[in-house]
Amino acid sequence: MLFVGLLVVGVVVGFISGFFGIGGGTVVVPVMILFGYDIKYAIGVSIMQMIFSSVFGSFVNFKSKMLDIKPALILGFGGFCGALTSGFIVSYFSSKFLLGVLILVQIINLIKLFKTPAEPVGEANGSKILLFLVGLVVGAVAISVGIGGSVLVIPILISFLNYDIKRAVGTGLFFVVFSSTAGFLSLAAHELVHYDVGIMLGLGSLIGVYFGVKTSHKISKTAQKRWMVALISTILMITARKFLLS
């Protein structure tokens, strides 16, 4: 029964990952806690699942010409470096402190994203140093609380670096490939991963992410931005509730 439940969760999370360009940890971690897992092990499982969905989803985006490899690689390398510190951060800082940092970043992103038009004006900021630094900071913070980081990266790309939303979503999902791989290695070294559960979730996510990516390609930029604002608002409320109850 647990096996079927994990596969279903994986499919749902995969669709969300592909549609929004996120890792899916914001869904997986609460569900794993509901299944009785400690939050630190829930984070480990969440990160492992992200590897499956982000790699396959990025492949689909690339084949559909919705992914610019060069800037995404720079951003991803920064995320990889930042995420390597996640094992230390999770072990050293309290969960409440990490949630507080995440809430602050989400509030800033949401306000800025809400004010930014769906269609960008002018060229995107392609600064390699800036992309690397964004990846570095987001990778360190996000993986430490069990999310891939693109839910933070995408609003930054849209609102601060003037990215087109569809380009930002493709870049965000590719970012998760790097951050989740580094986070997985770091958390595995600290023995915080249940491999069997992560594999079951990952297999389910392969199905969902394909349909999520294809759906995101078909909807308008305005509609996609509205869905993104709704997603971040929901995540913010869930995170704030968790912070207040912790």
Language model regions located:
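Juxtamembrane transmembrane-helix boundary motif
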Residues: 1-15, 27, 31-35, 39, ...
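Short, conserved catalytic or interaction motifs in soluble domains
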Residues: 24
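Membrane-embedded alpha-helical segments of transport systems
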Residues: 48-56, 81-82, 89, 175-182
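Extracytoplasmic gate region of multi-pass secondary transporters
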Residues: 150-151
